[in-house]
Amino acid sequence: MASVKLGSKDQRIINWLLEEDQPSVRYYTLVDILGRKENDPEVREAYSRIPRRGWAKDILKLQKPGGYWERREPSWRKDVLGWIEFLYRPKYVATNWRALVLSDLGLTSKDKRIRKIADLFFDYKLRLGSPFNFFTEEACIVGNTARMLTRFGYSDDYRVKKLYDRLLEDQREDGGWNCFRPDRGTLDNWEPLAAYAALPKQKRTRKIEQSIAKGAEFYLQRKLFEEGKSKYAPWFRFHYPTHYYYDILIGLDLMTKLGYAEDKRLRPALRILNDKRLTDGTWLLDRVHPDLGPGAGYDLDVKKVRRLALEEPGKPSKWITLTALRILKRVEAAS
């Protein structure tokens, strides 16, 4: 990986990201931005601290002994609706949503607490023959689960491979995916491409590579944000955790990670990314999902939803800034 050319402002931002309060951000900055190797002593030290300090520690300390958060496991193992409630509700603090964040932060099955999470999904969600399993679920759910379990270290498990098979089957003719319409894809359904991006390149089959190319073209044709008659305002705001919501930052991260950093059709979205950069070199966390801000166009009973926030919205964000710098580095390396 090419080294980053840093100006004085950039170096201040790097130093900020390297602070030890969030070892996950420090680890990814060392590896993805500064190009350090995994066997580098500082990299190894930062990685070892991820479950012991910062966001991951805060999430893990709330985990129940059985590996879950919030609701108890259904007493009857074939209680399908009970398992859905158990894994997914309340949004966005139940087991599924917290597990997705832990997978983003870099934790793997080397940690027994992560193995407990995976066991819950394997026990119910991926059981063949379940009346509500990966054969009947939406691509957003399948993609998120495949991404999470792949990052946890289960990409070789046959049950995870079945998830990828399902994503291949569910891709629309236009190259996209859609949880709600069978006739066409939508930019909102980015989770399958995120699952592909999590899969090491050497483990991608020819069919997956073809699906990536078709899916990437779907996004590039739309410049990552052109869908419908008018611009959808929340897509132009940056968020984390993302859950299953889309924005331009997600699109840029996926396209550059999947090898399309040189494509000229990214330029409008890259201009938006650069325009949103503050004078001090950072980027804001604009909103925490669900984003009900201007232009959202929908209402939600907030009593049924609990936001999962790692950082304060409206302020410079280490996670958003790290993601933006990753994108810009890939573009620079490809040029």
Predicted region positions:
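Preference for long, amphipathic alpha-helical scaffolds in soluble/luminal domains
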Residues: M1-S335
